[in-house]
Regions:
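Hydrophobic, small-residue-rich transmembrane alpha-helices and their short perimembrane loops
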Residues: 1-189
Length: 189
């Protein structure tokens, strides 16, 4: 609701595209994290299977799976920045200052989503890790990350959310943020 307040009175304090840019930035940042999490979960079994044949083959599968995430982040970043620029420049004929201000808010949306994904993932990871350690080591007397401990699944999910989804959203935000910072400097000059 607060995103729409600056232009409710009609004075046009900010561009009317700012709330939508913020929302799409957050959406694409979350999408990058989600795609990274899906890639990581599907490639773990393939990497383990390939590593059972040879270490070289396992390494190739792991590196190619990781590069998919990198290309996804770059592709989503270029797609969203390009679409916003083309729409604002050629459909609505906005000036460069309005385009830069709107697209900086797109970067703020991506940054907000990345922050929540990283912090939320870190909290979930630590809570699952502590729970698995308490149940496994203290109560049952089994070693850490033992497959007999069912809390290990929650620990692995927490690692996936914190380290993969949070990192994907963070990389997307950093990539788009660097592009949009240079665009803002170019518009201000």
């Amino acid at each position: 609701i607060l995103a729409f307040v600056p232009w409710i009175n009609g004075e046009g304090l900010v561009s009317k595209f700012v709330p939508f840019a913020f929302i799409t930035g957050g959406f694409y940042s979350c999408l990058a994290g989600f795609i990274g999490m899906r890639i990581a979960t599907s490639s773990n079994a393939r990497t383990a299977n390939a590593a059972s044949e040879s270490l070289n083959r396992g390494l190739r599968v792991a590196i190619s799976s990781g590069s998919v995430m990198g290309f996804t982040v770059v592709g989503l970043g270029i797609l969203d920045v390009s679409v916003w620029f083309l729409i604002l420049k050629y459909v609505f004929q906005c000036d460069s200052t309005t385009i830069a201000n709107t697209m900086v808010m797109f970067g703020m949306g991506a940054s907000c989503a990345a922050l929540f994904a990283r912090v939320g993932g870190g909290i979930f990871t630590k809570a699952a890790d502590v729970g698995a350690d308490l149940v496994g080591k203290v109560e049952a007397g089994i070693p850490e990350d033992d497959p007999r401990n069912p809390a290990t699944i929650a620990d692995n999910v927490g690692d996936n959310v914190g380290d993969v989804a949070g990192m994907g959203a963070d990389l997307y935000e950093s990539y788009c943020g660097s592009i949009l910072a240079s665009a803002a400097l170019g518009a201000a000059a």
